[in-house]
């Protein structure tokens, strides 16, 4: 059996090995043997900002102002709109507009937090949860107040047992010591382990107890989502920004970008850089700037060769395009998108074709099988890409069919990396 790329989500600590549910980062045979001998099976998250410390640092003050009538729901939504905050999980839909759409729907309304984080190369949401869970929760409660939400569901990746235990503990603390009366109930749901459950309608199917299959749209989840009710769906990082944007003002956030872009975002950087990890950087930063200013440059003996700007689904670009601003829409002319900002850096010791084959095997493995273009298309692409010389016209035609006819973004985005290899690394697959 050929190896399949599963996102272990410890990319910044590669090579990583998971012993039961205990991650061994920068793994060596000795370190793995020690973990086995010690019987370590679960990671315990420590060092996070707990409830008492969060309150001492001004946490939940904004939520209290909202409930006391010092802030109006419309002013909070206007702050998000003025800041230009967009969904930071992949689609990039304007957050303020989404709040208005759901708010205008008939009650009862629900909120679903997508913490599934299945895109290979992405680990920023886990990083945030392990450090400052109450900043997320305050964003959740402010959104629930502004939109009029009755109940919140947090769909958490099952490979994050430490985050789950942490959130359960902090939610118990909030129940015993609520910052405001009448907080909506929050229910944690374990992710089903499928990549496709990161798609919002598939996630909703999974929360409802069914197999995570994407829905045909319309209706959209903002109109008919969880249990048939209007549902606000947000990624962890999007909600993480709510408190700071409203506190500091939309103008502050909008002024942070580079190269004509606006805002800040967290990049999950892995690969051949000297200092991988989660990097808070201006929207629109270029890869070259990101590597030089935030990652300590490339690793010794490695030169930039290629990069994936948006994880497995975001396509691939060569080093000569390392000065393209990385933000929504700016990468589309090159057949790529930023998605969840999972930046994977390759050097001259890597081959783009190997990355592409690994990515397509991942998509073929993770296809839910509901629609033929994705189910059969990814399998056919794997077979065609296994050849030493690629049949470019056939792969291009296959990719177009997948984009046009697949139900969800998995099948629509899977051909991106194929197109990138053919456009920029044809020498690797040519006769």
Regions found by a protein language model. Give the residues of each.
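Ferredoxin-type iron-sulfur electron-transfer modules in oxidoreductases and energy-metabolism complexes
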Residues: 1-2, 18-36, 61-80, 107-109, ...
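Flexible inter-domain linker/hinge segments
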Residues: 34-82, 234-237, 241-249
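Conserved phosphate/anionic-ligand binding catalytic regions in large, soluble enzymes, centered on
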Residues: 80-101, 193-205, 209, 364-376, ...
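Histidine-anchored nucleotide/phosphate-binding helix
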Residues: 132-146
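Short acidic, glycine/serine/threonine-rich loops at helix termini
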Residues: 13-18, 91-92, 96-99, 122-125, ...
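Short amphipathic, charge-patterned alpha-helical segments
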Residues: 139-143, 283-300
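Gly-rich Lys/Arg/Thr-decorated short loops/hinges at beta-loop-alpha junctions or inter-strand turns
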Residues: 54-61, 113-125, 221-226, 268-273
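Hydrophobic alpha-helical positions that pack around
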Residues: 164-283, 295
């Amino acid at each position: 059996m050929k190896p399949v790329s599963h996102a272990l989500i410890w990319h910044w600590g590669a090579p990583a090995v998971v012993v039961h549910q205990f991650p061994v980062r920068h793994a060596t045979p000795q370190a793995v043997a020690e973990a086995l001998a010690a019987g370590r099976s679960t990671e315990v998250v420590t060092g996070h900002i707990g409830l008492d410390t969060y309150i001492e640092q001004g946490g939940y003050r904004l939520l209290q102002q909202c409930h006391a009538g010092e802030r109006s729901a419309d002013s909070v939504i206007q702050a998000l709109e003025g800041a230009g905050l967009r969904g930071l999980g992949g689609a990039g839909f304007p957050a303020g507009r989404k709040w208005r759409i759901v708010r205008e729907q008939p009650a009862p309304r629900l909120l679903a937090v997508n913490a599934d984080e299945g895109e290979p190369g992405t680990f920023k949401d886990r990083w945030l949860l392990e450090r400052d869970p109450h900043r997320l929760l305050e964003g959740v409660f402010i959104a629930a107040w502004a939109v009029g939400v009755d109940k919140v569901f947090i769909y958490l990746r099952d490979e994050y047992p430490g985050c789950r235990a942490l959130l359960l503990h902090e939610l118990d603390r909030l129940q015993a010591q609520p910052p405001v009366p009448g907080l909506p109930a929050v229910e944690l749901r374990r992710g089903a382990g499928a990549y496709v459950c990161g798609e919002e309608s598939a996630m909703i199917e999974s929360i409802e107890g069914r197999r995570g299959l994407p829905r045909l749209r319309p209706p959209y989840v903002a109109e008919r989502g969880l249990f048939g009710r209007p549902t606000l769906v947000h990624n962890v990082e999007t909600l993480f920004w709510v408190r700071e944007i409203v506190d500091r003002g939309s103008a502050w956030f909008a002024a942070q970008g580079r190269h004509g872009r606006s805002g800040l975002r967290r990049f999950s950087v892995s690969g051949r850089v000297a200092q991988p990890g989660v990097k808070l950087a201006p929207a629109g930063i270029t890869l070259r700037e990101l590597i030089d200013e935030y990652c300590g440059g490339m690793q010794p003996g490695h030169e930039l060769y290629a990069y994936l700007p948006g994880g497995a689904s975001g396509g691939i670009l060569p080093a000569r395009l390392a000065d393209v601003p990385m933000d929504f829409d700016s990468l589309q002319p090159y057949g790529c998108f930023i998605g969840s900002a999972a930046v994977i850096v390759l050097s001259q010791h890597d081959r783009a074709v190997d990355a592409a084959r690994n990515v397509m095997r991942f998509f073929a493995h993770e296809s839910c099988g509901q629609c033929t273009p994705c189910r059969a298309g990814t399998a056919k692409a794997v077979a065609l890409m296994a050849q030493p010389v690629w049949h470019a016209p056939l792969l291009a035609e296959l990719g177009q069919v997948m984009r046009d006819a697949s139900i969800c973004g998995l099948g629509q985005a899977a051909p991106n990396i194929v197109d990138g290899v053919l456009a920029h690394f044809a020498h690797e697959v040519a006769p």
